[in-house]
Swiss-Prot record:
<feature type="region of interest" description="Disordered">
    <location>
        <begin position="100"/>
        <end position="152"/>
    </location>
</feature>
<feature type="compositionally biased region" description="Basic and acidic residues">
    <location>
        <begin position="113"/>
        <end position="130"/>
    </location>
</feature>
<comment type="similarity">
    <text>Belongs to the SZRD1 family.</text>
</comment>
<feature type="compositionally biased region" description="Polar residues">
    <location>
        <begin position="70"/>
        <end position="80"/>
    </location>
</feature>
<feature type="domain" description="SUZ">
    <location>
        <begin position="42"/>
        <end position="107"/>
    </location>
</feature>
<protein>
    <recommendedName>
        <fullName>SUZ RNA-binding domain-containing</fullName>
    </recommendedName>
</protein>
<dbReference type="InterPro" id="IPR024642">
    <property type="entry name" value="SUZ-C"/>
</dbReference>
<dbReference type="InterPro" id="IPR024771">
    <property type="entry name" value="SUZ"/>
</dbReference>
<dbReference type="InterPro" id="IPR039228">
    <property type="entry name" value="SZRD1"/>
</dbReference>
<dbReference type="Pfam" id="PF12901">
    <property type="entry name" value="SUZ-C"/>
</dbReference>
<feature type="domain" description="SUZ-C">
    <location>
        <begin position="111"/>
        <end position="152"/>
    </location>
</feature>
<dbReference type="Pfam" id="PF12752">
    <property type="entry name" value="SUZ"/>
</dbReference>
<feature type="region of interest" description="Disordered">
    <location>
        <begin position="30"/>
        <end position="86"/>
    </location>
</feature>
Length: 152
């Protein structure tokens, strides 16, 4: 590369034929490489013959799984902490206490007995005020002409 002259611009290089020479060199190199890569790989291929034993068959061992998802533990220890079982009366008492604390009333029956007056009643419109669904429009132009119906 030291003996090659560097052109001032690509136009000078094209005029002198330098670009063509470089392209030809690269093309020859790639053709040589492609010829080398087309040859089949030289890997030894072993052909098995039935007359020669291939060796002992692979050993298969059946392993036992641990009792609890891969974790070996004592049978005395449990995975979940034991919570005391509450009776229905205890659960209802806790629910009433929490409801009183949050909502201010102890039982849902108290609220159902009161009529709900806060909700506005729905006012229905009479049928004659409503607009018909089959509205037919007849467009007019800006100057009062027939609009789209105008023929030319």
């Amino acid at each position: 590369m030291e003996d090659e002259e560097v052109a001032e611009s690509w136009e000078e290089a094209a005029d002198s034929g330098e670009i063509d020479r470089r392209l030809e060199k690269k093309l020859k190199i790639t053709q040589k490489e492609s010829r080398k890569s087309k040859s089949p790989p030289k890997v030894p291929i072993v052909i098995q013959d039935d007359s020669v034993p291939s060796g002992p068959p692979p050993q298969i061992r059946i392993l036992k799984r641990p009792a609890t998802n891969g974790v070996l533990s004592n049978p005395n220890s449990t995975t979940r902490p034991a919570f005391p079982v509450k009776s229905l009366a205890q659960r209802e008492a806790e629910y009433a206490e929490a409801r009183k604390r949050i909502l201010g009333s102890a039982s849902p029956e108290e609220e159902q007995e009161k009529p709900i007056l806060d909700r506005p009643t729905r006012i229905s419109q009479p049928e004659d005020i409503r607009q018909p669904n089959n509205v037919i429009r007849q467009p007019l132009g800006p100057d009062g002409s027939q609009g789209f119906k105008q023929r030319r």
